[in-house]
Amino acid sequence: MPNFVHLHVHSEFSLLDGANRIKDLPVRAKELGMDSIAITDHGVMFGVIDFYKACKANGVKPIIGCEVYVAPRTRFDKEPNIDNKYYHLILLAKNNEGYKNLSKLVSLGFVDGYYYKPRIDKEILEKYHEGLICCSACLGGEVAQNLLHDNLEKAEEVALWHKNLFGDDYYLEVQANTLREQIIVNQKLVQLSRKLGIKLVATNDAHYLKKEDSYNHEVLLCIQTGKRMTDEDRMKFETDDFYVKSPEEMSEYFKNIPEAIENTVEIANKCNVDFEFGHTILPNYDVPEEFETHFDYLKKLCDDGIKIKYAENVTKEILDRAEYELSVIKKMGYVDYFLIVWDYINYAKSQGIPVGPGRGSGAGSIVAYAIGITDIDPIKYSLIFERFLNPERISMPDFDVDFCYERRQEVIDYVGRKYGQDHVSQIITFGTMSARMVIRDVGRALDIPYAETDKLAKMIPNELHITIKKALEQNRELSKLYENDPEINKLLEIAIGLEGLPRQASTHACGIVITKEPVDTYVPLYVRDGLISTQFIMTTLEELGLLNALQISGIHIVTPPRTLTSRSSL
């Protein structure tokens, strides 16, 4: 069996474009005899941690990458009809330095360069190229575009620029599809490779798992673009070649240039990124100068708080409980965590921003009660501290804190001022195609009347985590339609194939992350409607040990009393 590694692969996080589910990619790679596989989503790194974990769980080496967009001029140029064009480029992380640089580039694409797409430019590529492997990408790459338009001198110039920057880590990318343009470009890339001494690498730009998934992928593109399968001008791939092909298929396609296959293994061997899980990276909290340690300051706040909260009713039980909790907090390294949360709650209260009494297991801490993080006495209500924090707990604890919805942003702004705006970010979340939604989406793409698909969608029970397959088991009427009506059978089969894929990204309603170094040192950033958020969801940030425990919820329950109080004073 020939050795080959897929280095240009789009997962479900190339939203409404990639149809490869992350959990399936390493499984399929292993089935086909491959021991490594890459993820290179369009302009984002949403799925890299899930991908990394899935690969590791299946004994497959994960290669972390991204297909970035490159501005034709600079990332700051945003002139209509000129700068809405962009080139594609594949970047793969060789090591953890490369991952950090890739994260920085992807972040800057959103923060500085967003114009239709998140774009980088050659200036920042030069600045953050260390630890990265670069491939010339698909037909949308700058080299390929110039070759396609017979601008050979420019193609050479572009290729040499990248070669000078990346050295032996720059490759010209040939792809295994039957598009007429690709066949032409492949031939010219081979010639360019021999002329300039730049290595070739074979890829397949895999957007779906198997050949038979191509139709579902076409439907997915219709959902993305709002088109119907009957529209002649719809966006589509002209062949069904864009799947995770076997090493044999790839080797057969490139039998005349076997070095392009061999170089995939060369690249895979160069790539070794590792993530650490289960540790905590807390930002530094500055304590007053008169305190030698952060723990001394927390203990002083706690001692003072106990005197205020319990006054003459301080008992040995209370003091012992506080001493025990403080020892656990210190031992587990969460002193700064308590101080950070105390600080922004204290700020909110000082500004007259209504704060909730506290929710969840954090209410079981007498230290939290004493210093004012919560307003619930754990002694009075027999609440257990160990539910919140104990040496056996692996995951990071968190306080659920509710603020007046109308003034929540003031608290976030304060945190940004205190720790630095580049050390604070909101957190991304994803909406997925639920059972009912995907039926309506697929029905629209197939040009089935809305009334019919809506009726079908309403047959799905209104239950949490319901799937179409479960609904078919529960609803006999739906099952009969599925079995007896070819049109509905087709619709539901496609819907099952697409169900659960992420549909859109948005900002988490109440989470923010605070980091020791700038956020994009650890995770890539995303921008939507002017709001900066992480590209990783909250649970992923927790796994990476980042302080995303600032559950700054803005709830209306806290808000109306303040509004009523204001009105009653008029």
List each model region and its residues.
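Alpha-helical scaffold/interaction cores of sigma-54-like transcription cofactors
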Residues: 1-551
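Residue-level detector of conserved catalytic or cofactor/ligand-binding positions
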Residues: 552-563, 567-570
